[in-house]
Amino acid sequence: MAKFNVLDHNLVPEHHIVSEEEEKTILKELGIEKEFLPRISPNDPVIKALEAIHGKIKDGTVIKIIRNSPTMGHSVYYRVVASEVFK
């Protein structure tokens, strides 16, 4: 059975790992602490696909999500990888 890469699906938005330097800039621009970002589970299929490319992604890593829209062009979202998604 062939492996399916969820990142190649047309309904899955672009996901990128944010560098620590870029993370500081983003959090400063947004005026928030990392703990206030929405969370994404390390078991999310997209995180697993990114790990296949980049290696293990640890808790606290910020992920940049770029969603395309026919009406808005695109919008950027950020999520932080967290084992405890619901507190």
From Swiss-Prot:
Subcellular compartments: Cytoplasm
Classification lineage: Archaea, Methanobacteriati, Thermoplasmatota, Thermoplasmata, Thermoplasmatales
EC number: 2.7.7.6
GO annotation terms (biological process): transcription by RNA polymerase II; transcription elongation by RNA polymerase I; tRNA transcription by RNA polymerase III
Protein name: DNA-directed RNA polymerase subunit Rpo5
GO MF entries: DNA binding; DNA-directed RNA polymerase activity
GO cellular component: cytoplasm; DNA-directed RNA polymerase complex
Disulfide bonds: none
UniProt entry keywords in alphabetical sequence: Cytoplasm, DNA-directed RNA polymerase, Nucleotidyltransferase, Transcription, Transferase
Function per UniProt: DNA-dependent RNA polymerase (RNAP) catalyzes the transcription of DNA into RNA using the four ribonucleoside triphosphates as substrates.
